[in-house]
Amino acid sequence: MTAACWTSEELDQIGSADELRIAPVRGGRTVGRSVPIWVVRVGENLYIRSWRGASGAWFRAARASRAAHVCAGGVERDVEVLDAEERASDAVDAAYRQKYGRYPTYVEPMVSPVARATTLRLIPRPPHAQRA
């Protein structure tokens, strides 16, 4: 599939939102229950992590299907869910600390090796590929 790009407006809106709601696709095309998670922007990319590590239910479902529906900052999009490249990890850690540093009890687990291993990149699906 050819991925679309986030618009500057989408990046700004999602990147500045405190939470993103993610609903992983389950069983092919059924969108599951949405859950609130943290999201960070690094350059032109959006990243998410599982606070519970690889055992998080939303993480397992999103990683298995590689697809989800997200909503944050007034933006709703169907997305591809890809494993982030290891080289992005330090920048993603820094983005979590900068954005969520006011929650030190929660941000430290988000930059731990357990959560870091669950870093996913969100790629918007082209409009013609959006769910019907």
Features from the language model and the residues they span:
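Extreme N-terminal tail/first-helix region
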Residues: 1-21, 132
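Short, P/G- and charge-enriched loop/turn segments at secondary-structure junctions
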Residues: 8-10, 25-26, 106-109
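Short, flexible segments with low predicted structural confidence
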Residues: 11, 33-34, 67-68
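Short secondary-structure boundary/capping segments
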Residues: 11-12, 38, 110-112
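Short beta-strand segments
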Residues: 17-52, 60, 80
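Short, structured beta-strand-loop surface elements
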Residues: 52-126
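Short helix-loop capping/hinge motifs at secondary-structure junctions, enriched
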Residues: 127-131
